[in-house]
Structure formats: structure tokens, C-alpha cells
Amino acid sequence: METSSGTPELKVISTPTYGGHYVKYVVAGTDFEVTARYKPPLRPIGRGAYGIVCSLFDTVTGEEVAVKKIGNAFDNRIDAKRTLREIKLLRHMDHENVVAITDIIRPPTRENFNDVYIVYELMDTDLHQIIRSNQALTEDHCQYFLYQILRGLKYIHSANVLHRDLKPTNLLVNANCDLKIADFGLARTLSETDFMTEYVVTRWYRAPELLLNCSAYTAAIDIWSVGCIFMELLNRSALFPGRDYVHQLRLITELIGTPEDRDLGFLRSDNARRYIKHLPRQSPIPLTQKFRGINRSALDLVEKMLVFDPAKRITVEAALAHPYLASLHDINDEPASVSPFEFDFEEPSISEEHIKDLIWREALDCSLGPDDMVQ
């Protein structure tokens, strides 16, 4: 399969620092300082509010890697905590369909620790790029992508973690069609209570219970997102491209129907119940009627994912066992997490300096010292 992220190598300025143990590159006007373990070719492969991502060659493993720089990582407590959460989560996890952190590059001195450099496995592209490209997608491609998403999600959920932000850009793919789930900055454990206070999860893939501000939600929110993503793969366009909350709910009810009273047991808020009851009554449209030409078994699985009542939504284990995935499903090759993940740093009083210290310790724990590096 072709990939769509072949970014050309840039000519970048590089300067050895700290006696050659570190190298500072200037990438699109941004300083990018890494240990000498990481060598060119350097390619910028992503940029966002957090900072910049570049690919480099890891002289220890002999493989290309993705290095994400989070600039001024401790200026904002919420952002810093998000970084700490992703580091701890991904270092806890060990699964073929979850992207791995291979290193956290510690700075030369603790005093200089303002930017965080996280090293990940390098993938070629993501599902968003593939969906938007002219790349032909066969039924087998879509089926294999779905299987891998669910296989990774089974592991994540078994670790007592909800991803909460599954969307095509967070599903990384390589040329062999291997898929890995990424971006755990919004993830939560089931025991955490401040579920929706910090960030807004991408609207198009958001389950009804999130749109209705239900705080007691479950792993079913991720299953809803998978249903939306899989239909987008099959149909090459977003299933529910809502402009705002109201439009999002309208698009959902126009397709799957207005829920009955018996399907609203998960709503604790009288206002949310009243809102749903005042929506225009809609009957569900069978997916086989709306999406003619798409595999009926695939649509049957999607219909079981896109159920308004989260308690009636299919679980990840049941989805893996659905007839549509029979050719790929092997319960003996779909591992669960050995132990649940616990994130113990949610106290409102935790300071930026405390978070910095915790990330520093993570860097010490997983990176080689400069004297141990390949020069």
C-alpha cells in the first residue's frame, strides 16, 4: 500500500552542543536539540499546538523514529499534565496496535528542562491522510484496519483506560498496513472523575452521552468513535460532520433515530432528557438502505456500534467476535493488559514544578545517558 506522508528531507542547520553529546538543529525557525544518538536525515513530519515532530535516525536501534518536541512544556499545568499522562500511559502499555515511546530525551541539565522531547515509533501516515487521498481502499484494507483498531482497543480497555479521542488522525499506519493507536493525552482511567473538564474531544466522533454532558460514561464512548471512523473509511467521507453540538445530535438522530425513553437511562440530567424528548421524532434509517454497495455484515457491525444507549452498544470483545471479522479474529492473539493502569497525579493542587520533576524521572528511567550513546 502506498503512503502519503513522504516529506522531503530539509537542509537544516546543525550545531554540536555540550561537547558533541547533543546536537541543535534549526527546523522551520524552531530549535530542535537532541542527543547525538539521533542523526540525520531529519524531516519535519508534523506540527500542532504542542510543537513540532521530526523524523530522525536512531543509531542505537538502527531505525528511523519520530521525535516530538513539546516546547515550554511546563508553562501551563493542564498541558503539562496531559504530557505526563501520555508518557506514563504509553510506557505502561505494550501492544502491537498501540504506538510505543522508545525514549524521552533528557536535557543536559535539570535546570535547562523546559522542552520535552518524546521519541516514538515512526509510522508512515495516518487514516485521515489515507481517507482524504486518492489511494484505493479495498474491502480487505478496511476490514484489516478495523480489526487492528479493535485489537488495540481491547488491550487499552483491559488496562482500565478510555482513549476518549479516537479519530482518523490518531490512527497511525505504515506501508504494510500495520495500524497503531496514538495520542493518549486525553485518555482517562475509569476511576478518574474530572472526565471532561480540560479538553474538548473532537466533535464528529463523539458519542451521544458526551454531547449530552453525561459525566458517568464508560468504554462505550470509544466504540462509538470506532463506528464513525469505520464508516468514514468505507464511504470516504465523515459520517456525522456536525458544525456544533446541536447539529451533531441532529445528524445522529436523523440516521439512527430518536431514542425512546427506555434508552435514556444513562442520562442523570433532567435538562438533557427534556432536550432529547423535544427533538423532532425520527425513525432510524437502515444503513443498508443509505449505503448501498457496502458489505452488509460490515454495516451490521457498525449498527451495533452506533447505538444511542451506551449500555446497549456492542463491547470491543463482542465486536472482535462479530462474523464480519471471522477471517481475522483469533482470541488467542488478542492480548489483554497484564495489569490496570493507574494515574495517581490528578490532584488539583499538583504544580507545574512537580509535574516537571515527574517527567524528569521518566526521562532518567527510560533514556541512555550521554556517555552511553553511540557517537
Curated annotation (Swiss-Prot):
Signal peptide interval: none
Q: What coarse category fits the chief subcellular location reported for this protein?
A: cytoplasm
Enzyme Commission numbers on file: 2.7.11.24
What is one Gene Ontology biological process annotated in the Swiss-Prot or TrEMBL record?
A: intracellular signal transduction
Residue numbers bearing the Phosphothreonine modification: T197
**Magnesium among keywords:** yes
Motif stretch (TXY): 197-199
Q: Which InterPro entries match?
A: Kinase-like_dom_sf, MAP_kinase, MAP_kinase_CS, Prot_kinase_dom, Protein_kinase_ATP_BS, Ser/Thr_kinase_AS
- Phosphotyrosine modification sites are Y199
Residue intervals passing through the bilayer: none
Q: What enzyme category does the UniProt record give?
A: transferase
Q: What does the UniProt PTM comment say about this protein?
A: Dually phosphorylated on Thr-197 and Tyr-199, which activates the enzyme. Phosphorylated in response to pathogen-associated molecular pattern (PAMP) chitin and in response to necrotrophic fungus B.cinerea spores. Not phosphorylated in response to osmotic stress.
Task: Report the sequence similarity comment from the record.
Answer: Belongs to the protein kinase superfamily. CMGC Ser/Thr protein kinase family. MAP kinase subfamily.
Name of the protein in its database record: Mitogen-activated protein kinase 4a
Q: Which organism was this protein described from?
A: Physcomitrium patens
Taxonomic lineage from the root = Eukaryota, Viridiplantae, Streptophyta, Embryophyta, Bryophyta
Q: What gene, per UniProt, encodes this protein? A: MPK4a
